[in-house]
Amino acid sequence: SSAASDVYKRQSYHTPDGEVPALNHVSLTLRPGTVTALVGPSGSGKSTLATMLARFRDPDFGTVRIGGVDLRELPSTDLYRLVSFVLQDPYLQRQSIRDVITLARPDATEQQVRDAARTARILDDIDALPAGFDTVLGEDTNLSGGQKQRLSIARAVLADAPILVLDEATAATDPDCEAEIQQALAALARGRTVLVIGHHAESVIGADVICVMENGSIAACGTAEQLAEQPYWVRLSAGRIMEGVTR
């Protein structure tokens, strides 16, 4: 529902080790069905802000809300049905591949699990393992970075959550199938409320809203056209910045 996919962040800020604020009184509303991209230099707070939506961390002050409900009041099972995430360095616990994919849908059928793996271009890799979907990560096998990415995409596909948190650098972790992963991500994002952690101008230029972050605050928000005079966006668009590092 539109209410479930209306994400609202208000005065959220987080201080690692109680020192410099990683986020400083940030307010941001994600409208249902739109794509919002966060861009900014390394350390600007974009990943901290985005991962709060998946409750990897909670704000010291302020709230993160979905449909008016504070995330801290939501059971994790409900949160996983509302928010799925595909991040640059997916943290996968020591559990079976099946358990990883079915995080939000533990009652999924075998066919649904296989279909999700197929959509994420990881099914053949799983079937090639002696234990298949029962393979325990970190014990029976160690997956490549690209395979872990595709596993997290399969999890998001199966979850079918209305909100998606996505790091657009995901595809770059596996050059051999970068185009396939991009296609899977594009299909996954369609029709959802999406929050993108952006690193390259061309990958976020079509976003409904682009927010430029600096020093834990939002410096400017708008379309690519509206940000034409914003210094960081100008440098990013000109290709002078890669992965948040000026070259």
Describe the residue ranges of each PLM region.
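Short, small-residue-biased leader/transition segments that mark boundaries at the very start
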Residues: 1-8, 94
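A short, flexible loop at the N-terminus of ABC-type nucleotide-binding domains that lies
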Residues: 2, 12-25, 75
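Conserved beta-strand
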Residues: 9, 21-31, 36, 62, ...
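ABC ATPase NBD Q-loop/coupling interface
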Residues: 14, 63-78, 179
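ABC-fold ATPase nucleotide-binding domain signature/coupling loops
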Residues: 18-21, 59, 65-67, 123-151, ...
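The feature captures the beta-strand-to-loop junction immediately N-terminal to the Walker
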Residues: 39-41
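ABC-family ATPase nucleotide-binding domain "signature/switch" substructure
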Residues: 44, 48, 54, 81-89, ...
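ABC nucleotide-binding domain "signature motif"
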Residues: 60-70, 209-210, 218
